C-alpha cells in the first residue's frame, strides 16, 4: 500500500498496490490524486506533498521571469504526463516562495531536486531539453 498526499486538499491517502494508482481518488475531497500535470507547491503545501508521499518527488524550482525555466516548462509538463503515477512532479515558484528557495539553498534556476521519503537525494541545476530531462528523471528516480 502506497501513501500519497492529495494535491488539492493535502489529505494523506493510502493507495492499494493492486489497484491502478492513476485512477485513485482522494478519500476526503474526491479529487484525482494524479492528473498527469505537475503540481504547484507553495510554502504551505510543500512539506505535505513531499513527506506524505511514498513515491519519488521531483521539484522544479523556477521563476516566472526566467527564460530557461519557461523554455523547460513544456518538457516538464510532458514528463509529468509520462511518469505519473510512479513519480510526482512539483513546481515551486521561487519568486512567490522565497522561503523554500532559501531553505533548500537554491542559487540558480531552474534547479531540479529529487526527494524520497522526505529527504533530498539529488539535484541538477540548469534547463534540459525534453528527452534529456525525461532520461535524467528516470535515471535518478529508479534508485530513489
Protein language model annotation of sequence segments:
Residues 61-75:
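Conserved redox-active cysteine motifs that mediate thiol-disulfide chemistry
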Residues 41, 61, 76-99, 106:
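Thiol-based oxidoreductase modules, predominantly thioredoxin-like and allied folds used
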Amino acid at each position: 500500500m502506497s501513501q500519497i498526499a492529495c494535491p488539492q486538499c493535502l489529505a494523506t491517502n493510502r493507495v492499494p498496490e493492486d489497484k491502478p494508482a492513476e485512477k485513485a481518488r482522494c478519500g476526503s475531497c474526491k479529487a484525482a490524486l494524479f492528473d498527469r500535470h505537475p503540481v504547484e507547491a507553495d510554502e504551505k503545501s510543500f512539506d505535505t506533498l513531499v513527506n506524505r508521499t511514498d513515491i519519488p518527488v521531483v521539484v522544479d524550482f523556477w521563476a516566472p521571469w526566467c527564460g530557461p525555466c519557461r523554455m523547460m516548462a513544456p518538457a516538464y509538463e510532458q514528463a509529468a504526463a509520462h511518469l505519473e503515477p510512479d513519480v510526482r512532479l512539483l513546481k515551486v515558484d521561487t519568486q512567490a516562495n522565497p522561503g523554500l528557495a532559501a531553505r533548500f539553498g537554491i542559487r540558480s534556476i531552474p534547479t531540479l531536486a529529487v526527494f524520497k521519503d522526505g529527504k533530498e537525494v539529488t539535484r541538477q541545476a540548469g534547463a534540459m531539453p525534453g528527452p534529456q530531462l525525461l532520461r535524467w528523471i528516470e535515471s535518478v528516480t529508479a534508485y530513489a
